[in-house]
Amino acid sequence: MYVHIDNFLVYLRVEKNASPRTTESYQKDLFHGLDYFASRLGKEDHAIVPSDIDHRIFRHYLAHMQKQGLARATMARRLAAWRSFYRYLYREKIIDGNPLLRVASPKLEKRLPRFLYEDEAKELVEAPDTKQPLGMRDRALLETLYAGGLRISELVLLDLGDLDISSGYIRVTGKRARERLVPLGSMAVEALQAYLAKARPRLMANSVAKKINNALFLNCRGERLSARGIRKILDKYVEKVSLERKISPHTLRHSFATHLLNAGADLRSVQELMGHVRLSSTQVYTHVTGERLKKVYRKSHPRAKG
């Protein structure tokens, strides 16, 4: 089984352009299942072949995870990893049939995306001290994240060449290497101009390697800023402005979509700006805005009270 899993991970990296984090997640979930199947079948894990695992064993696996008290989302994710793996095995003609076609995934509760209100988003992105180089960088970073509705992985990958500051556009490389052009508002452009002119050269001077680094956002050592580094920066300013709930970089992306729809943007345009392949991925934000409007109605309309 290990050979097939290794080949599948290569397929994800090379053909599906999956990120290292994604392939690592798949590997972890597949190995978790493999440990259970080895125990269930009374075999060494390296001796298991795909045909050893039928739909009954997959159902036992689900029951086992349920007994462990795992969240439905965790169970569904692990099963989804095995679904993808077995679809790959079937396409490669390694198995004759897919046993997971007979296994239902756990039903998940639909959770609405968390977002910031407009005044909260404004307070957060304006929190950095722009008198300092790192503050200039942080302001530009937060403005770009919010103004462009970027995923954290997209922000990390931005290079200087992706930014057309004069036109106010940024080229974003999304999932599966799909590119899109995203407009930036005047505030994001101003923050980026200040960062590029005054702060980035000083951060670049700190580079130990003394090599040209094309990354748009740099850390204090003049290296490309990592996803972990961006999360730390966001956490710092969330604490500074005392937002009393959990905020992630994706919260700013959710806020971007919600605020556009609240202001009357059409769904197709928001879909394109966010880089969603399916409209259904964008439609979830209409539920968010719908819930907000419902609360306003119930609070304000005389016939809704009581």
Swiss-Prot record:
Any Pfam family hit: Phage_int_SAM_1
The keyword Cell division is assigned to this record: yes
Residues spanning the signal sequence: none
Domain Tyr recombinase: residue ranges: 111-298
GO cellular component, one term: cytoplasm
CDD domains in UniProt: INT_XerDC_C (cd00798)
Compartments where found: Cytoplasm
Any one of the GO BP annotations: chromosome segregation
Domain Core-binding (CB): 1-90
Record-annotated active site: 151, 175, 250, 253, 276, 285
Molecular function via GO: DNA binding; tyrosine-based site-specific recombinase activity
Broad class of the protein's primary localization: cytoplasm
Alphabetical UniProt keywords: Cell cycle, Cell division, Chromosome partition, Cytoplasm, DNA integration, DNA recombination, DNA-binding
Coiled-coil positions: none
InterPro entries: CB, DNA_brk_join_enz, Integrase-like_cat_sf, Integrase_catalytic, Integrase_recombinase_N, Integrase_SAM-like_N, Recomb_XerC, Tyrosine_recombinase_XerC/XerD
DNA-binding as UniProt keyword: yes
Function according to Swiss-Prot or TrEMBL: Site-specific tyrosine recombinase, which acts by catalyzing the cutting and rejoining of the recombining DNA molecules. The XerC-XerD complex is essential to convert dimers of the bacterial chromosome into monomers to permit their segregation at cell division. It also contributes to the segregational stability of plasmids.
Family: Belongs to the 'phage' integrase family. XerC subfamily.
Name of the protein this chain belongs to: Tyrosine recombinase XerC
